[in-house]
From Swiss-Prot:
Top-level enzyme category: lyase
UniProt keyword terms in alphabetical order: Amino-acid biosynthesis, Aromatic amino acid biosynthesis, Lyase, Pyridoxal phosphate, Tryptophan biosynthesis
Gene: trpB
Cofactor: pyridoxal 5'-phosphate
Subunit-structure text: Tetramer of two alpha and two beta chains.
Alphabetized InterPro entries for the sequence: Trp_synth_b_CS, Trp_synth_beta, Trp_synth_beta/beta-like, TrpB-like_PALP, TrpB-like_PALP_sf
One cellular component (GO) term of this entry: cytoplasm
Protein name: Tryptophan synthase beta chain
Keyword Lyase: yes
Role description: The beta subunit is responsible for the synthesis of L-tryptophan from indole and L-serine.
Catalytic activity: (1S,2R)-1-C-(indol-3-yl)glycerol 3-phosphate + L-serine = D-glyceraldehyde 3-phosphate + L-tryptophan + H2O
GO molecular function list: tryptophan synthase activity
Length: 396
């Protein structure tokens, strides 16, 4: 069996824990990715799509009224301004181009909040690929605008009713489909998790977030920020922000997991800090598990963070102490969501509001001149009905 070209592990995390039938597909994908990364024409086409279709580079906005502390500047990396409404579009364009390069005709994807599904649908429409999106039935119900968008762009949306009918079940169904169709289909995984080479591919196709941020900060402030802060579900927006700063040891990397109703309630999605290592979704990673080792249901107000595991590179960055991982509750995220809307006229995704909530908490504690950058990973249009129901007392 031919050897892998890239290291499938990040410390002890990662790997390729899949049925034997999928190993050739993953190796083929790794080969194609390595070749594409070295191919100037592929890179030129990807860069052109990011610039002229998706709208990169995205703005770095200094908030005027948000910071609770006059010594703290809070910048927002505006992935919410990207075509499609979230950071998801970046790596989806990269993977869809890669699929075309490999001669695949079909794309299979999973989605939670629907943002990855929308990004996949728009990339498939643009590049002439057939698109199937698996989505937990619960998420189909709570994200109807995104379901309509996907269907409008020609995607087939398949509700998944098994298990908890959320993202992890959609992941399982998508992987199952791919097992039988990989010769003609590419599985376009939506986060920096899953079996090798996906965590590496997704990081590389998201790393422009941090690269642009670094360049923009040096232009604006003449120095790097003290910390970059991003929400963590599977972890793609965060690893995209962190990747270019990992070697910049003066910059603190802070990931924010969803604490849901509170860590002590078990109604949360914070496996990095409160899970145990296990095998899930083709990788070795921290997992929410019960006392018998069964996967526990994760919970978050934001569908995109409602995931019982996390990408292996985040697990490694946590283990070696290079990044730290905090959490924010539903209530804190809701408060930050409203505060940003009222103070800056920007409505963030509920996912991004978790990162914002922690940034506000951190800003209050700072005792010297500090610059924080929050990755505003997506816009909040998709969440306005959820939030209005909660604020009007229609949900617990």
């Amino acid at each position: 069996m031919s050897q892998l070209k890239l290291n499938p592990y990040f410390g002890e995390y990662g790997g390729m824990y899949v049925p034997q039938i999928l190993v050739p597909a993953l190796k083929q994908l790794e080969n194609a990715f390595v070749e594409a990364q070295a191919d100037e024409s592929f890179q030129a086409e990807f860069t052109d799509l990011l610039k002229n279709y998706a709208g990169r580079p995205t703005a770095l906005t200094l908030t005027r009224n948000l910071s609770p502390n006059p010594m703290v500047k809070i910048y927002l990396k505006r992935e919410d301004l990207l075509h499609g409404g979230a950071h998801k579009t970046n790596q989806v364009l990269g993977q869809a181009l890669l699929a075309k390069r490999m001669g695949k005709k079909e794309i299979i994807a999973e989605t939670g909040a629907g943002q990855h599904g929308v990004a996949t649908a728009l990339a498939c429409a643009l590049l002439g690929l057939k698109c199937k999106v698996y989505m937990g039935a619960k998420d189909v119900a709570r994200q109807s605008p995104n379901v309509f968008r996907m269907r409008l762009m020609g995607a087939e949306v398949i509700p998944v009713t098994s298990g908890s009918a959320t993202l992890k079940d959609a992941c399982n169904e998508a992987m199952r489909d791919w097992s039988g169709s990989y010769e003609k289909a590419h599985y376009l995984l939506g986060t920096a998790a899953g079996p090798h080479p996906f965590p590496t591919i997704v990081r590389e196709f998201q790393r422009m977030i941090g690269e642009e941020t670094k360049k923009q900060m040096l232009e604006r402030e003449g120095r790097l920020p003290d910390a970059v802060i991003a929400c963590v579900g599977g972890g793609s927006n965060a690893i995209g922000m962190f990747a270019d700063f990992i070697d910049e040891t003066s910059v603190e990397l802070i990931g924010v997991e969803p604490a849901g109703k509170g860590i002590d309630t078990h109604m949360h999605g914070a496996p990095l800090k409160h899970g145990k290592t296990g095998i899930f979704f083709g990788m070795k990673a921290p997992l929410m598990q019960d006392s018998e080792g069964q996967i526990e249901e994760s919970y978050s107000i934001s569908a995109g963070l409602d995931f019982p595991s996390v990408g292996p590179q985040h697990a490694h960055l946590n283990a070696i102490g290079r990044a730290r991982y905090e959490s924010a509750t539903d209530d804190e995220a809701l408060e930050a969501f409203q505060l940003l809307a009222r103070s800056e006229g920007i409505i963030p995704a509920l996912e991004s509001a978790h990162a914002l909530a922690y940034a506000l908490r951190l800003a209050k504690e700072c005792t010297k001149e500090t610059i924080l950058v929050v990755n505003l990973s997506g816009r909040g249009d998709k969440d306005i009905f959820t939030v209005s129901d909660i604020l009007n007392g229609k949900e617990e």
